[in-house]
Amino acid sequence: MSVENIVNINESNLQQVLEQSMTTPVLFYFWSERSQHCLQLTPILESLAAQYNGQFILAKLDCDAEQMIAAQFGLRAIPTVYLFQNGQPVDGFQGPQPEEAIRALLDKVLPREEELKAQQAMQLMQESNYTDALPLLKDAWQLSNQNGEIGLLLAETLIALNRSEDAEAVLKTIPLQDQDTRYQGLVAQIELLKQAADTPEIQQLQQQVAENPEDAALATQLALQLHQVGRNEEALELLFGHLRKDLTAADGQTRKTFQEILAALGTGDALASKYRRQLYALLY
């Protein structure tokens, strides 16, 4: 099987692979074609190496061809598997094992899915690519049962995207022990965003809408302004109030704006999901 993170060990690459374990866990697999157990274990290990996609290196050592190296490890049985991390063996087993047991062994040292997603998101945040970081952090936050540290990253990203309402909702879930100076800084940023979001244009449109509550075109203008400053729930509620009465309000512009805001929020957004369901109920 040809996978980049599967290597066949020999005298020339043994030291290099051991050094690689300083940064990436290495699963050393000592096998022999004479062993029936290896016939069962080899495809399991190779399949896991492919599934984990570079999170660990599978280092295979043919004990018949590389007897000198095998002797250095003082093997007592074949197959034997050692898990190396930071240049040292940290776990292992002898004989056949089910896939679940091997996964459990790997999961002790490999980062969890939410950690990987958070790491990817942090890299994107460093590049100021908050749009692509957002879905990764949403997933990571849910996978981690709303971990406080990931929650702060999510709130920071939402603030950068001018979505103060959503950021505030996330910060409300942060446990007391995680409400440090960074948390306080994010709260302060949200307050500044809120102040900036109450623009004179919005205030004027709000007054006009209050005076002309049946004017869907005016309400659509206001909703667009609210969306642009991150006040999405207010915008959607305003638009939906008119759609509830007339799906073709403002010559269809109200529904078009409503759907554009939903699209901008993304498929995984809770607020967007809520209003998509409400629109669907109106349509069908």
UniProtKB/Swiss-Prot annotation:
One Gene Ontology CC term in the entry: cytosol
CDD domains given in the database record: ybbN (cd02956)
Protein name: Chaperedoxin
Quaternary organization: Interacts with a variety of proteins, including multiple ribosomal protein subunits, DnaK and GroEL. The reduced protein is monomeric in solution. Upon oxidation, its oligomeric state changes to tetramers and higher oligomers.
Disruption outcome: Mutant is highly sensitive to HOCl. Disruption mutant displays increased sensitivity to heat stress, but not to oxidative, UV, osmotic and pH stresses. Mutation does not affect the redox state of cytoplasmic, membrane and periplasmic proteins, but mutant shows a decreased expression of several cytoplasmic proteins. Mutant displays overinitiation, hypermutator and filamentation phenotypes with the occurrence of anucleated cells.
Annotated function: Chaperedoxin that combines a chaperone activity with a redox-protective function. Involved in the protection against hypochlorous acid (HOCl), the active ingredient of bleach, which kills bacteria by causing protein aggregation. Functions as an efficient holdase chaperone that protects the substrates of the major folding systems GroEL/GroES and DnaK/DnaJ/GrpE from aggregation. In addition, it prevents the irreversible oxidation of its substrates through the formation of mixed disulfide complexes. After bleach stress, it transfers its substrates to the GroEL/GroES and DnaK/DnaJ/GrpE foldases.
Pfam families per record: Thioredoxin, TPR_19, TPR_20
Keyword Transit peptide: no
Source organism (scientific name): Escherichia coli (strain K12)
Highest taxon of source: Bacteria
Domain remarks: Contains an N-terminal mobile Trx domain and four atypical tetratricopeptide repeat (TPR) motifs in the C-terminal region. The Trx domain lacks the canonical Cys-x-x-Cys active site of thioredoxins and is not a functional oxidoreductase.
Control of this protein's activity: The holdase activity is activated by HOCl, via the reversible chlorination of several residues in the TPR domain. Chorination probably increases the hydrophobicity of CnoX and enables it to bind a variety of substrates. Reduced glutathione (GSH) is required to resolve CnoX-substrate complexes.
UniProt KW keywords: Chaperone, Disulfide bond, Stress response
Database matches in PANTHER family: GEO12009P1
PROSITE patterns, A to Z: THIOREDOXIN_2 (PS51352)
InterPro entries hit by this protein: Thioredoxin-like_sf, Thioredoxin_domain, TPR-like_helical_dom_sf
Gene that encodes the chain: cnoX
Gene Ontology biological-process annotations: cell redox homeostasis; cellular response to oxidative stress; chaperone-mediated protein folding; maintenance of unfolded protein; protein refolding
Gene3D superfamilies associated with the record: Glutaredoxin (3.40.30.10), Tetratricopeptide repeat domain (1.25.40.10)
